[in-house]
Amino acid sequence: MTIQTKEKFFYASGAVANGVKNDAFTFFLLFFYSNVIGLAPGLASLAIFIALLVDAFTDPIMGVISDRTNHRLGRRHPYFLLGIIPMGLSYFMLFSIQLSWDLSQQYLFLWMLTFTIFTRLGMTIFEVPHRSLGSEMSRSYTERTSIFAAREMFGWAGGLFNAFLAYTIFFKDTPEYIPGTQNPEPWIYYGMTGAVLMSISVLVTYFGTLKYRNTSSNDQISFDLKLIFSQIFIALKNKSFLIFFFGYLFIAVSWGLNSSLQIYMNTYFWEFKSIMIASFLGIYVLSTFSAFLLVPRLVLFLEKRSILLFAITLAALIPPIPIVLYLNDILPDSGSWNLFFALAPFIYVANTCLSSSAIVRESMLGDISDEVELESRIGQQGLMYASSSLIGKLNTGLGILVAGLALEFIGFPQGSEVLPNAHQIFSLAMVQGPFVAVLMIIPFGIFSFYKIDRQKHKNIMSQLEAR
C-alpha cells in the first residue's frame, strides 16, 4: 500500500514533540541548571545518569507492552494520549524553578532529577509506539526510508522552532544579560511554550494516523514479566540489532557531547550574540531539508550502510576544522558577522550528514525488525524502536552526563557571575571539537559490519510473505 503525502505528514508531525524535548535537553538543560540556577555540573550529570537508568528499564518494557497490546484503538495509539500529561507537565515544571527560591544544592538536584525522569517517562510512553507505527505503515525498503526521512525532518523542525523562539523571543540580549540565556526570568515561559508545542504535536499525529491503528502482524496479545524479558533476549541474539544498538550508542555519546557543549562554545569561545545564534537556525533548516530530499534518492541506488558510513565520516571530520582554523588566526574575530559566515558552510555540511545518518538509521531498524520477525516468528517493532528511543535519549542524557563531567574536569565555573579563563575556554574547545571527532571512529567501525542490504531484505520479505 502506497503511503499518501498527507499521511506521512500526520505521522511525521509527532516527531515535533521529541524534537522540542531533545533541543531543550541537549542545548539548554545543563546550561540552565549550571549557569543560571547554580547547580553544580557534577550533580546535574548525576541526575541525568539516574534518569538514564530508569530509561534503560522502561523503554524496552514499553516496547514489548505496546507490541502485546490489544485495544480497539490498536496497539500504538492508546499510548499517544497516555503520554501527553506526564510529558508536558513535567517538562514545564523542569524549567519553572526560580533562582529567587534560593534552594540548596540538594533540593535543586532533587527537582531536576524528578522532572527529568517524568518528562522522559512521558516521552517513552508516546515515542516508542510512535516510532513502531512508522515501521508498520510500510515494509518497502525504499518507502520506509521516505517515511522516516519525513519524521526526521519534522523532528529537526520542532527542535529548530523551539530554538528560534528561545533566541528571538525568550532570551534576547539585554544590557543586564549578554547573552540573554543568562537571564533567569524567561525560562518558565520557555518551558511553558515547549510543553504546549509537544502536546499539540501528539494530538495531531494521533488523529491524523488513526487509519493505521490496526496495522499489525502479531496475533499474540497476552504478556507477563517473563515474556517481556524473553522478547528482549530474542532481540539481543540478533547480530544486526546488536550492531545497530552499539553503533548508534557511540554516535549518541559522541554527538550528544558535542551538542551539549554547543551553547558554551557559542557563548564563551565564539562569543556570538543571541541574534547570531538564532541566525544559525536558518542553516540548520536548510541542511535538514537537504537531507530530507537527498537520502530517499540516494537509497534508490546506494546501500544504506554506505550512506551511513559516509555521513558518519564527514560528521566527524568537519566540526573540528573551524576550531583549528580559528586557533591559528585564520578565521575572522570572535563575535563578528564575518566569523558567522565563515562557520556557516561547516555547520551546513556537518548537520546535513548528521540528519542523513539519522534518517538511514531509523530505516535500517525497520529492516532489522523484519529480520528478527523472520527468525523469531514474532513481530517486535515496538521493542526494536524502543531501543532507538532509548538511544535517542542517550544522545541527550549521556551527552549532558559527559559534558557535565568534562566541565567539572576542566574547572569550568558555575553560575552566571563568574567568567571562565582562557585556559578553560581552550579546554572546552578541545573537548567539543577534536575529542568528539576521535570518538566518532568507534561507530564507524561498528556499522562497517552491518550486513542487511537490498537483496538480503528482499529475501527476508519473500520468506515472511510465504508463511
Where on the chain are the PLM-derived regions?
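Membrane-embedded alpha-helical bundles of multi-pass transporters/translocases
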Residues: 1-467
